[in-house]
Curated annotation (Swiss-Prot):
InterPro entries: NA-bd_OB-fold, Primosome_PriB/ssb, ssDNA-bd. Residues 108-164 are annotated as: Disordered. GO terms for molecular function: single-stranded DNA binding. SUPFAM superfamilies: Nucleic acid-binding proteins. This is Single-stranded DNA-binding protein. It comes from Xylella fastidiosa (strain Temecula1 / ATCC 700964). One of its GO terms (cellular component) is nucleoid.
Length: 164
C-alpha cells in the first residue's frame, strides 16, 4: 500500500539570483525564489492575477547547475516535494518555513529571457538530482575555487529528427 504522494510541479520565474551555499562536506545547496502567477475571473468578469512566491532548494549537482545557469527573471520548470520545517529564531520565537526540495529542473526560455540555455535552436536540458539530506542550516562557503564544470550532456539525436 502506498504511504502517500508528495509531488510538486512548478513553472515560474526567478525573483532574484540564486543563493549558493556549501555544506562542510562540500555539497552545494542553492536556494531560489520562484514566482508563479495564476489568472482567474472574479464575479464581475474582471481578470484577477495572483502571484505566489515559492522557496525552492536544489542539492548537490542539481544545485551546482541551478546556481550556474539560473538568473533573476529566468523561467524554469521544477519538480520536487514540499517540506515544512519549524525552528526557533534568535529571538526565541518559533518560526515555520515551507520549501520545495527540487528533484528535477528544466530551464525554459531563451538566453534573452535569462534562462541561460535554450534559444538558438537548442533544446532546454532537463536536469535531475540524486538528492541527499543536507547538513545543518548554518554553513560557511568553501574557499573560493573555480570548479571546472562541463556543459550538460546533449541528446543523441539531431533536432531534425524531432517530428514537430
Amino acid at each position: 500500500m502506498a504511504r502517500g504522494i508528495n509531488k510538486v510541479i512548478l513553472v515560474g520565474n526567478l525573483g532574484n539570483d540564486p543563493d549558493i551555499k556549501y555544506t562542510q562536506g562540500g555539497m552545494t545547496i542553492t536556494t531560489i525564489s520562484l514566482a508563479t502567477t495564476s489568472v482567474r475571473k472574479d464575479k464581475d468578469g474582471n481578470t484577477q492575477e495572483r502571484t505566489e512566491w515559492h522557496r525552492v532548494k536544489f542539492f548537490g549537482k542539481l544545485g551546482e547547475i541551478a546556481g550556474e545557469y539560473l538568473r533573476k527573471g529566468s523561467q524554469c520548470y521544477i519538480e520536487g516535494s514540499i517540506r515544512y520545517d519549524k525552528f526557533t529564531g534568535q529571538d526565541g520565537q518559533e518560526r515555520y518555513v515551507t520549501e520545495i526540495v527540487a528533484d528535477e529542473m528544466q530551464m525554459l526560455g531563451g538566453r534573452s529571457d535569462g534562462g541561460g540555455m535554450g534559444g538558438g535552436g537548442e533544446r532546454p536540458q532537463r536536469q535531475t538530482s540524486q538528492r541527499q539530506d543536507y547538513a545543518p542550516r548554518r554553513q560557511t562557503r568553501q574557499p573560493s575555487q573555480s570548479p571546472q564544470s562541463s556543459p550538460p550532456p546533449m541528446d543523441d539525436f539531431a533536432d531534425d529528427d524531432i517530428p514537430f
